[in-house]
């Protein structure tokens, strides 16, 4: 799990270069701009477009906590 806020600030979406937000529930880094969720496995963010899943409902799923 990414616990250091500084690390999250350094990471950007590999497709858009935009900011990412952390979804602790799903263990994913979210790019609203690209509408993709990048998985975090064993504490390591997998920043490959081929590993990302498309967000459903334009990211509205993120607001259901």
Swiss-Prot record:
Pfam assignment, any one: Trm112p
Gene Ontology CC annotations of this record: cytosol
InterPro entries xrefs: Trm112-like (IPR005651)
PANTHER family according to UniProt: PROTEIN PREY, MITOCHONDRIAL, ZGC:162634
Family label: Belongs to the UPF0434 family.
Protein name as annotated: UPF0434 protein BH12860
Annotated organism of origin: Bartonella henselae (strain ATCC 49882 / DSM 28221 / CCUG 30454 / Houston 1) (Rochalimaea henselae)
